[in-house]
């Protein structure tokens, strides 16, 4: 019943240009509360106030005035403009309603049907189409150049993860496509360590500029991560190829709504052992939230945390959870040492823990709650015990690569 009602109201408002005296009566307190809730639920910024003004048409017929909306010069101008210009009202309403109904559908490439608008809107996070192809030989050559550039495995994996892990399955935003990690606001996020990020991006851009063929920075970032993982697996004794799907474009700053992207900034990323501050929610619960936004399963989350630790991707290079002497090598050392019964874990300040040798009392490693939940939670510990087995090292490498590719391609809707 709701859909026909919506269609009818749209038809009345747009085709017959009927706009009520709503804009002169102004709004009741109930309207204002609905307006605020719409702002939160639809990720609409306050400069989109048109949306709130128009949608309140459907809320109630109450005409109790709200002095702020009547007297505030900004709100009054908007209301009066719509009252005096019904065509502008109809256009803004159509756009605002379209935005509200499609806000969680992701980019325009996910839309289906003959009525998809040709115009791309900035809130759809547009990305230029790719117009190049590379052969397998050219991709292999690119990998070699990246590995010879002086960037470490940690540099390449951290940057690729930072770019791709912004993806949110809840509204299909974020991800590596577009390479917005090099643009504001992502390039300045604390979790991305701007100084280190700038160093890596500068090297990748130099490689891009030296190429005879066109390739996007977005593809180079992901390819760099793939090359680094292949090297780390080879150092562990496994000759593997990380699948790579070409076709990411580079968005521009003009195609990026800074205010809209600020809400994607992570307050916590357990995969990089990062947390902005202490929250009422535990660090391990924030890890679960991050994992579900990335559409990861429990095994996928588990292998990714191990791999990220042993590859040295911790925020600011901390050693918490880095349970290995072979940093940069893709091993299951994190799992093996987490299960070490020769140490006793004791709490420290700041939500950290230290492992002391049961015989000598020497501190041998430190960890966060995120690290230790893989030993304390029954489901996660069962997974850890599987991957810690000597005969499952190759399985771990294969499963890590599969989970890694899932994150790298999370926003590649063109591959579905």
UniProtKB/Swiss-Prot annotation:
Post-translational modification as stated in the protein's UniProt record: Formation of the three residue Trp-Tyr-Met cross-link is important for the catalase, but not the peroxidase activity of the enzyme.
Alphabetical list of InterPro entries matching this protein: Catalase_peroxidase (IPR000763), Haem_peroxidase (IPR002016), Haem_peroxidase_sf (IPR010255)
Superkingdom, natural source: Bacteria
GO biological process: cellular response to hydrogen peroxide; hydrogen peroxide catabolic process
A single Gene Ontology CC term: cytosol
Disulfide bridge map: none
GO molecular function, one term: heme binding
Swiss-Prot/TrEMBL keywords: Heme, Hydrogen peroxide, Iron, Metal-binding, Oxidoreductase, Peroxidase, Signal
EC number: 1.11.1.21
Residues spanning the signal sequence: 1-20
Enzyme class, first EC level, given as a word: oxidoreductase
Note on cofactor: Binds 1 heme b (iron(II)-protoporphyrin IX) group per dimer.
Catalysed reactions listed for this entry: H2O2 + AH2 = A + 2 H2O; 2 H2O2 = O2 + 2 H2O
Cofactor entry: heme b
Pfam families: peroxidase
Coiled coil: none
Metal-binding found in the keyword field: yes
Described purpose of this protein according to its UniProt entry: Bifunctional enzyme with both catalase and broad-spectrum peroxidase activity.
SUBUNIT field: Homodimer or homotetramer.
Family, as annotated: Belongs to the peroxidase family. Peroxidase/catalase subfamily.
Protein name per Swiss-Prot or TrEMBL: Catalase-peroxidase 2
Encoding gene, per UniProt annotation: katG2
């Amino acid at each position: 019943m709701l859909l026909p009602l919506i269609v009818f109201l749209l038809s009345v408002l747009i085709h017959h240009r009927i706009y009520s005296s709503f804009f002169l009566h102004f709004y009741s307190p109930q309207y204002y509360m609905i307006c605020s809730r719409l702002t939160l639920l639809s990720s609409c910024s306050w400069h989109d106030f048109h949306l709130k003004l128009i949608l309140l048409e459907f809320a109630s017929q109450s005409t109790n005035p709200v002095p702020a909306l009547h007297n505030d010069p900004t709100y009054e101008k908007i209301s009066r403009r719509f009252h005096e210009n019904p065509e502008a009202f109809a256009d803004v309403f159509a756009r605002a309603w379209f935005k509200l109904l499609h806000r969680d559908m992701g980019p325009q490439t996910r839309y289906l049907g003959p009525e998809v608008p040709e115009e791309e809107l900035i809130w759809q996070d547009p990305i230029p189409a790719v117009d190049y192809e590379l052969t397998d030989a050219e991709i292999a050559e690119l990998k070699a150049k990246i590995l010879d550039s002086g960037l470490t495995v940690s540099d390449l994996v951290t940057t690729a993860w930072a770019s791709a892990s912004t993806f949110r399955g809840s509204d299909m935003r974020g991800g590596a496509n577009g390479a917005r990690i090099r643009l504001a606001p992502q390039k300045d996020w604390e979790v991305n360590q701007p100084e280190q990020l700038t160093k890596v991006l500068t090297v990748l851009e130099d490689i891009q500029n030296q190429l005879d063929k066109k390739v996007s920075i977005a593809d180079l970032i992901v390819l760099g991560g793939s090359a680094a993982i292949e090297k780390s697996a080879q150092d562990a004794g496994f000759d593997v190829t990380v699948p790579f799907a070409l076709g990411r474009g580079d968005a521009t700053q003009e195609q990026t709504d800074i205010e809209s992207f600020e809400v994607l900034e992570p307050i916590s990323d357990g995969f990089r052992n990062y947390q902005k501050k202490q929250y009422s929610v535990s660090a391990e619960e924030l890890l679960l939230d991050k994992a579900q936004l990335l559409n990861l399963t429990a095994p996928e989350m588990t292998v990714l945390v191990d791999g990220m630790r042993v590859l040295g991707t911790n925020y600011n290079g901390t050693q918490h959870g880095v349970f290995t002497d072979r940093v940069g090598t893709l091993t299951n050392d994190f799992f093996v040492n987490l299960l070490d019964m020769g140490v006793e874990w004791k709490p420290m300040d700041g939500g950290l823990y230290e492992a002391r040798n049961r015989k000598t009392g020497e501190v041998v490693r430190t960890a966060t709650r995120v690290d230790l939940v893989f030993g304390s939670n029954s489901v996660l510990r069962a997974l850890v015990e599987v991957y810690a087995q000597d005969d499952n090292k190759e399985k771990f490498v294969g499963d890590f690569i599969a989970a890694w590719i899932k994150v790298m391609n999370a926003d590649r809707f063109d591959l579905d």
